[in-house]
Amino acid sequence: MNQNIFVVYPSGKLGDFIWHMPFIRHISNISKREIILITRESTSAKAILADENYIEDIYYIPFKKGFFNYIKEILYMQKLFKTLDAKEVWILDKISRPAIAARVANVKTINGFGVTNQSLWITNKNQLEKKDLKIHYIERSNKFFNQMNYPINYKFININVDESLLETSRNQLSPNNEKIITYGIDSSEMWRSWPKEYFIELILKINKKDNYKHILLASPKNAYLADEIINEISDKNILNYAHLGIKDIMPILKVSSMYIGNDSGILNLSAAIGTKSIGIFGATKSFDYSDNIIPAIAKDGEISTTTDRLLDNKGKTIEDPKLAYRVKPNDVFEKFIENILF
């Protein structure tokens, strides 16, 4: 059996996972082989990476807190590493469980960030410092690979979408070449989500400019927001697609003329698929890691110049829903006019 390369990415946030995909591919390039990924199901990695040629297989682990969960997950990963003959394990995080499992499985090369108790189990000597945990995820991983003597020229990932799914979406949504705008109307942290009244005002402004089909995306628990927006506008060309999973959302994003939405995982996914995407950054600081992301910020500037969100005197995030109101509908509409092709 060929020895395998494992990458463990334990975070469950979609946007963070997409930010880390270039690093996962980089490990595949370093190793000159496909990799086996271990991550959380909430990343939707199996759907997102279905058409990528640097992935051999994907395993989901919940990475739950609690002593018994720790033991259960260590034993599961240890068996996985042993059964699939792991040659190397890369851990793109500071947690110890994968490193312990790899040690017990007698994996010779275990690379991780270090910093915490993980440093007792990994084999790489060049590790990150505690202060590195405060910098952005991308900068942190960039530093890690530089210290490992595997520098990366970081470029935002391009995700492939199955052609048959694209064709189905085109036929269903745009049989007569209708122009589509997709909206991400919620967020995993709703305090930083744009209010529905602003989405309504924006859609009405866009409708005055040209005819578009508007598709509203949200998590199923926030589907009611899409219904409320549709009820206010009463336009047959506005559709509630909040019931869809990532696999079905991806081709819709790809066939859209533009995506407009909150700073969220779907914004990153849309940009990675190749769609021009306006990100609404009222409660969070904008970023420029992708040419496809067009930041819409408040007239009075970024929420912060030093951190990605506003912090109080104790360093805790200020979760004030009013911060999202800083970006007005006209701020987003101006970005739309500047970047859409009529």
Where are these regions (language model features)?
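Catalytic machinery of carbohydrate-active enzymes
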Residues: 1-342
